[in-house]
Amino acid sequence: MAQVQYYGTGRRKSSVARVRLVPGEGRIVVNNREISEHIPSPALIEDIKQPLTLTETAGTYDVLVNVHGGGLSGQAGAIRHGIARALLEADPEYRATLKRAGLLTRDARMKERKKYGLKGARRAPQFSKR
């Protein structure tokens, strides 16, 4: 019989993560590499594992992730969002816990566009009185 799998798609900034939860011993694989190889920051790795620790499922699922776009912070946020959605598919009982922690909400903050006449989104050129 086919193995049980749960899917979740997470997004953050310009990153998109497709997450698959498979019953296992708790390995996290990102783009066919161990998580520590793909994301060097321990703080971001802890951030990614947050949905698993909150629902106490850290050692019960292997997490297989395909992620593209954005930088490390955006990718970490997208993976976290995807894991939360996949856990919800695995067991709808987790909704209250994940919702309270704010893990099911897509973070809508994006980079503000640069405006003409300015040096950045809001930074104005230096003002000279004389």
Swiss-Prot record:
SUPFAM superfamilies: Ribosomal protein S5 domain 2-like. Transmembrane segments: none annotated. Keywords: Ribonucleoprotein, Ribosomal protein. One of its GO terms (molecular function) is RNA binding. InterPro entries: Ribosomal_Su5_D2-typ_SF (IPR020568), Ribosomal_uS9 (IPR000754), Ribosomal_uS9_bac/plastid (IPR023035), Ribosomal_uS9_CS (IPR020574), Ribsml_uS5_D2-typ_fold_subgr (IPR014721). GO terms for cellular component: cytosolic small ribosomal subunit. GO terms for biological process: translation. Belongs to the universal ribosomal protein uS9 family. This is Small ribosomal subunit protein uS9.
